[in-house]
A protein has these predicted regions:
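Short, well-ordered alpha-helical microsegments
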Residues: 30-31, 187-189
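Accessory N-terminal region flanking or inserted into the helicase ATPase core
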Residues: 1, 19-21, 93-179, 188-193, ...
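P-loop NTPase Walker
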Residues: 1-68
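Walker B catalytic acidic pair
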Residues: 182
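A short helix->loop->beta-strand "cap" motif at the edges of active sites that frequently abuts
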Residues: 46-47, 199-203
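Conserved phosphoryl-transfer catalytic core
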Residues: 71-97, 201-205
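A short acidic, amphipathic alpha-helical/loop segment
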Residues: 6, 36, 190-197
Length: 205
């Protein structure tokens, strides 16, 4: 049985759409779930606040503004300060920290840092596991330190921070049913967020 059939059953049982969460990894999957329910049931998207990506849910739960989220321009500024180049990516369509990463040296280094955080590993352990000797360990540490300092001073956050903060708060929305889409794509950290979401609903898929 597909998630959409199970969601249909929940609605038929009388569970209000705003008490059903369907979370996913990508915006595309979240949008498809929302549109399917809207089309089948004539429900307004605004009445389905929890059909969204995990990052969107963490963003909204934390009450953040888009100005607080670190983006490519800030990454270039950090790169200039430490002498490590970053690419010229724009801000559009960014929905994970990996989306801010391009193909330059700084981007390549940051992808290793984001990967370590998403897997719940130390940077050193991640570096050791990947065994990529094209990466200068001292340079990587210097960049990560500058990145975290910048966020602290400028009061900025990234997508991983949002999910980490959500997990730390251990307080999910008041819902009756939880559906997890694209489960195979979720990281260790994202599964920790799903564990928080699982605390209240009686129906879980």
């Amino acid at each position: 049985q597909t998630n959409s059939n199970k969601i249909r059953e929940c609605i038929e049982q009388g569970i209000p759409p705003d008490r059903i969460a369907c979370v996913s990894f990508t915006r595309k999957a979240a949008k498809e779930s929302r549109e399917r329910v809207c089309r089948d049931w004539g429900i307004d998207e605004r009445d389905m606040p929890y059909f969204q990506t995990l990052h969107s849910m963490a963003f909204r739960a934390g009450g953040y503004s888009s100005d607080e989220v670190i983006g490519p321009a800030e990454m270039r500024e950090i790169g200039e300060a430490v002498g490590i180049p970053f690419g010229n990516k724009g801000r559009s369509d960014i929905e994970t920290d990996f989306d801010t990463v391009g193909v330059s040296k700084g981007d390549f280094y940051m992808s290793q840092y984001h990967l370590s955080r998403s897997k719940g590993l130390s940077l050193e352990e991640m570096h050791r596991q990947l065994g990529d000797y094209s990466i200068d360990w001292s340079e990587l540490k210097r960049l990560v330190s500058a990145y975290e300092d910048y966020k602290g001073v400028r009061k900025k956050i990234d997508f991983t921070d949002m999910i980490s903060n959500f997990v730390r708060s251990a307080d999910g929305p008041d819902i009756d049913a939880l559906f997890v889409d694209e489960a195979q794509d979720l990281s260790t950290l994202q599964w920790s967020m799903v564990d928080v979401l699982r605390k209240k609903p009686r129906i879980q898929v």
